[in-house]
Each structure stands twice: as C-alpha cells, then as structure tokens.
Amino acid sequence: MEEATDEEVQCLLPLVSAQRREQALRYKHTFGQFCCLKSWLLLQQLIGEVEDFEYNEHGKPFLPNGPFFSISHCKEGIAVAIDDHPIGIDIEAIRHADDDLIARTMNELEQSKIKNQKSKIESDREFARLWTQKEAIVKAQGVGIQSFEQLQTIIDNRKSNIETFEKEKYIYSIAYGKLCSISAKVQTTEL
C-alpha cells in the first residue's frame, strides 16, 4: 500500500490514546498518519494496552514501565520489535539506491561492498541491508540518526548483535543489546 485515505485514518484514531492521535496528526501526509496509527496498534497487539510514552533526550519514545520497543514502517510494511532490553528495528523496501545517497550514508568499506555485487538488484539489496542495520543500531542506542555518517556498521554479523532478514520485497534488521537474545518478539505486517 502506498497511499491511505482520510477515512482510513479517521477510523483508526479512536483506537489509540490521545497522545498517539496527536503524534499521528503531526505527520503532514495521510500515509504517514496511517502508518503511525497502524504501527501503534500492532504494538498494542503484541503487548496489550499501551500506556502513554515518554521521550529520551534524543526524542526516542519509550514506555516508562517497559518493555523496550522499536517501530519502523515503510511503504510496504510495518515492523515492531519488543524485548526486555534495548532493541532497534528498521524495515525498508528493496529499491534503487542512487550513487549520491550511497555516498552520503555509507562509509568507504560499505560503498565498496555495495558496488562489488554481481547485479544492480544485488547492489540495491546490499544497500537496504546496510541501511537497515545502521538505522536499527541507532534506534537500539536511542541516539537518532544525527551520527549516521560516522556509524561503522559491522559487516560480519557473526560478531555483532544485528540480525537481518529478507521477506518478499523488503529487508528488516534488528539490533539488540549484549545481554539480550534474539528471542525478542518481532511482528511485521504488509500494509
């Protein structure tokens, strides 16, 4: 789904807290509002009634009484991860990544890894894999993406706390703390 109607958003608004309604309506476009609401409803489905959240100094929302959670959405789907320890998730569609975007968001090693793939689709897949890993890491750390260019994604997942998965036309990555396992609950849904 790449669009949502005002009617769909209006149907979802009564199903979430006043705080989440306010957050959703801050999105300029209807589709952003829709994704914000649907992702919160998916979180509610996983953990039950969701209390109002607070924000850390970098703007990351958290539940004062736990659990830790992370939400991501793109035009193709929504992903939610929860755990007893800090966790980050990102989901992205596999799509064309232009050279300018690659240069702005990837370090030299990552750029080389992307460009050395056997085909353009494999390069796009590798870009999505690295992008979601970076995004998941900054979400797990709760620091936001202001440090994106400096972040060194560890390519060898056997030595890192990052798991990356591909499902149909999108890739999602989960970054989790040293003390937690990958037993976190993860739910994805297509829009």
Regions found by a protein language model. Name each.
Residues M1-L191:
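Core catalytic alpha/beta fold that binds nucleotide/phospho-ligands
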